[in-house]
A protein has these predicted regions:
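Short loop/turn motifs at secondary-structure junctions and domain boundaries
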Residues: 259, 294, 301-303, 404-410
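Flexible, glycine-rich terminal cap/loop adjacent to redox cofactors
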Residues: 12-49, 54, 59, 63-70, ...
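Gly/Ala-rich phosphate-binding loop of Rossmann-like dinucleotide-binding domains
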Residues: 22, 26, 204, 208-209
Length: 481
């Protein structure tokens, strides 16, 4: 075993939370190392930083969503703009190569940032060995060596893995999880997706745009229960109109492979009737589970929940002093930016500062077309809490920029406290909703009122004017409706 190194903080995991935490530690002058053992190998076969988000999640999915959207624009929308395109085809291997190049470039960028901020980047499997005077002992194992480290503080940032579905074995050839669905080399004629959550909808959107017949099987009786009900209904209407087939209240019972290579997916529908469908590719997108096993957390007595999450307080402290956990391994939404915020907070706390995350002001986004974005409370949550509120809505059919873009689908919905007018929630369905939700997030973070938003000058013509109009609708009334 190699000689010990002594650190101020060791971060286990170089995903969104872990690498940002490590960089912030370096900025604060802490002696920091970050360990990564993920299976997403770089061209040299070494573990690559970035975690799920960079390697098989946020970034590659957005690359494919962008490519597939460009393809659909050419085929379905170009003529409306006076553009005539004949015979356009999709080179799927070239599309995948573009995606891979983006991932590689960003992974190299993270390693550069580690060097810039004096973060020791260690590639190997971290195992917690136990306590030592004033800290903890951790072994980092590679195929040919083991290095022991001591550290005053420990940050668990090991992310999550796709949830397995009993009886459905993922091979990432015909039966895929998110990683496999982002790496197909041809467009399947028929694709079935188990799970109508964010991952299922985004992956389904990619391959539907390229020509696949997409059927989504969902055990719940409705789409996107975490969304505002108005938003969920509108999303279902729009995606159905685009050609996605949804089957709700369906429970998968088995999978069979036919001699022609097709897959037969058996399920029981909402009425309890046995049914089945045939597909060429199956995507399993039934959620994710925290990655906490094999780390040695039990060696220190770190408490976990019944669902396997590390139990933490508001500042991501675990039950063991000096041990923190962030990102997908702790409570809350599995979002890259939430993990990043927690990483910054934890390092500032370790450095003696007042790190903080406002969990009421973390935006969520679904990158379908149109996009869906929200921050703050839904109308259902306000009703359940007994909070008196007012609602303002504004449709993009009355927005000049949306008309010019050729896509007027969706709306903005603003929820404000009935007494104080404080903005409690903002929900958007629109092209570029992901770029508009920032204003709403800032409004909630700084406790702005709907009137505040309504009195701020918004550039014209823009899509985000609709946020102002929806805010005005709560009070004196929208100006353009």
């Amino acid at each position: 075993m190699a000689q010990q190194q002594s650190l101020d903080v060791l971060v286990i995991g170089a995903g969104s939370g872990g690498y940002i935490a490590s960089i912030r530690a370096g900025q604060l002058g802490l002696k920091v190392a970050c360990v990564e053992a993920n299976p997403y190998a770089d061209p040299k076969g070494e573990p690559r930083p970035g975690g799920t988000c960079l390697n098989v999640g946020c970034i590659p999915s957005k690359a494919l969503l962008s490519s597939s959207e460009e393809f659909e624009k050419i085929h379905k929308h170009a003529l409306a703009h006076g553009i005539r395109v004949a015979g356009a085809t999709m080179d799927v291997p070239a599309m995948i190569a573009r995606k891979d190049a983006i991932v590689t470039k960003m992974a190299q960028g993270i390693e550069y940032l580690f060097r810039k901020n004096k973060v020791a980047y260690l590639k190997g499997q971290a195992t917690i060995l136990g306590r030592t005077d004033g800290g903890f002992r951790v072994a980092v194992t590679r195929s040919d060596s083991t290095q022991e480290l001591t550290t005053r503080n420990l940050v668990i940032a090991t992310g999550s893995l796709p949830r397995e579905l009993p009886g459905i074995e993922v091979d990432n050839v015909d039966v895929c999880d998110n990683a496999g669905a982002l790496d197909l080399r041809s467009v399947p004629r028929r694709m079935a997706i188990i799970g109508a959550g964010v991952i299922g909808l985004e992956l389904g959107s990619v391959w539907r745009r390229l020509g696949a017949q997409v059927t989504v099987i969902e055990a719940l009786p409705q789409l996107l229960p975490m969304c505002d009900a108005d938003v969920a209904r509108e999303v279902l209407k729009l995606l159905t109109a685009q050609g996605m087939d949804f089957r709700f209240g369906a429970r998968v019972t088995g999978l069979e492979r036919a001699s022609d290579g097709s897959l037969g997916l058996a399920y029981v529908d909402a009425k309890g009737t046995a049914d089945s469908l045939v597909c060429d590719k199956l995507v399993v997108a039934v959620g994710r589970v925290p990655t906490t096993s094999g780390l040695g957390l039990e060696t220190l007595g770190v408490k976990t929940t019944q669902r396997g999450f590390v139990d933490v307080d508001a500042q991501c402290r675990t039950s063991v002093e000096g041990v923190y956990a962030i990102g997908d391994v702790v409570r809350g939404p599995m979002l890259a930016h939430k993990a990043e915020d927690e990483g910054v907070m934890v390092m500032e706390c370790i450095a003696g500062q007042a790190g903080h995350v406002n969990y009421d002001a973390i935006p969520s986004i679904i990158y379908t077309s149109p996009e869906v974005a929200w921050v703050g409370r839904t109308e259902q949550e306000l009703k359940d809490a007994g909070t008196a509120y007012r609602t303002g809505k504004f449709p993009f059919t009355a927005n000049g920029r949306a008309l010019g873009n050729g896509d007027t689908s969706g709306f903005v919905k603003v929820l404000a406290d009935q007494k104080t007018d404080a903005v409690l929630g903002v929900h958007i369905i629109s092209t570029y909703a992901s770029e508009m939700i920032g204003e709403a997030t800032m409004a909630i973070e700084f406790k702005a009122s709907a009137e505040d938003i309504g009195r701020i000058s918004h550039a014209h013509p823009t899509l985000y004017e609709a946020i102002r109009e929806a805010s005005l609708a709560i009070g004196t009334g929208a100006l353009n409706l």
